[in-house]
């Protein structure tokens, strides 16, 4: 796939999913959910204040009647109710509305709720469409794990692979990002990238092609790989997925590619029993729509 709009098309083929939206009462969220409904992706269930929802719908020219509204004015209670809906099978996909990410994640991680498996690994995966890259790019982790350890990185590779498979990439090329494409023994991200690449060579990480360490420019641009004389890499200049060494590098790339590079994104939480949409409260309606589509595509 080259465009996020293709994810919408693929998700539509799976039929409508029931979408539980926690504190879904802001204009961007309601516009995205309404668009997803019109695209044939979801049957929306909103947890929030009916009066506010109706007022925002009126201001945004949205047909409020298409929403099933569960009245609740408290944002934390909205999260808990929405989480319970997906856990009990009343909904298929969870989505964050106007509530803060911290409160949303606490609801997901609540052991009593049953959405997050014991000893599981929660992560964030995004699909990025950039004007200057010829295909969609799957990236992780940019929002959840501050400093993934080696074992967590192997799990993140599994998440990247799953999303890549969903968007039509049978054998994804995964780049383990580090400061340099040269192996630097004193830099942990560099040595771990090399170890992951060796595991991949031996088939320990599934049906993927993986290489590292690779600097960002070498991973994405063949010209950079040629100039730096990186030889023998099937990933350099043609990566499908980027595994970042920490949240700082991933988050900076994520925001720079969208806010400065003109990119669009779809994002979701991985590691839960059902797909969970996680976008920023300031993200556009289009970003939220694409994220809904990605989660619907991942839903059973």
Language-model-detected regions and their locations in the chain:
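Anion-binding alpha/beta catalytic cores of soluble intermediary-metabolism enzymes, centered on
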Residues: 1-235, 240-300
